[in-house]
Amino acid sequence: MDLLQAAHACLQACDPVEKVALTQQYAAAFRAGSLPLPAQADAPEPICMPGRPPRPLLVHPRELPRRGLGTPEGRAAFIHAIAHIELNAIDLAWDAVYRFRGVPDGFYADWVAVADDESRHFMLL
């Protein structure tokens, strides 16, 4: 497996816990030098939407009830929203790794580090 295949696998992972585990595994392997960049790579396959679990159903935020931070439900909804932001940040970082070909190695290293950081943020929530 190479770094671009790892990025694709992370983008396709539907379970958030699996996505985080793969991210941390591949980031560690990349740092250790055991997940190489391919010398030549074909154009990336289009990814319309990163993997998501089948439930809960994604809805527009306007369709959700407004909750203030003064209630336990409101605080839970706030943390849930932040978790979504962190999960999307993981996908955005892997998308940058997967989508852009032929850029300097440091570009990939930086985005792998971002994905790894965002996975830790997700787990903190």
Task: Describe each PLM feature range.
Residues 1-125:
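Non-heme di-metal
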